[in-house]
UniProtKB/Swiss-Prot annotation:
GO molecular function: small ribosomal subunit rRNA binding; structural constituent of ribosome
Family: Belongs to the bacterial ribosomal protein bS20 family.
UniProt-recorded name of the protein: Small ribosomal subunit protein bS20
Entries under PANTHER family matching the protein: 30S RIBOSOMAL PROTEIN S20, SMALL RIBOSOMAL SUBUNIT PROTEIN BS20C
GO biological process, one term: translation
Entry keyword annotation includes Transcription: no
Designated gene of the protein: rpsT
UniProt cross-references to InterPro entries, sorted A to Z: Ribosomal_bS20, Ribosomal_bS20_sf
Superkingdom in the source lineage: Bacteria
Biased composition, class Basic residues, residue ranges: 1-10
Length: 88
């Protein structure tokens, strides 16, 4: 365990940030799986509406620095391609 006051504070902040980031990443994985499940079921309209929510969540998470901006863009792009392919 940390001995200095500043390192104790840092350790506490790390725990809080770790928890927050883990929650955000879990939400991203969940909504991605939800979109994929809707695509697999053939529910194209539901998949499109869920895709919009997923895009918003990816952009917000990237803006907060939990994931990189280009990672968010890549994942949104791949999700969009899957949804568009299912709509055809």
């Amino acid at each position: 365990m940390a001995n200095h006051k500043s390192s104790l504070k840092r350790a506490k902040q790390d725990i809080v940030r770790n928890t927050r980031n883990k929650s955000r990443k879990t939400a991203l994985k969940t909504i991605t799986k939800k979109v994929d499940a809707l695509v697999a079921d053939g529910a194209a309209e539901d998949a499109k509406t869920t895709l919009l929510a997923a895009q918003k969540l990816f952009d917000q998470t990237a803006a907060k620095g939990t994931i990189h901006k280009k990672t968010a863009s890549r994942k949104i792009s791949r999700l969009t391609r899957r949804v568009n392919a299912a709509a055809k």
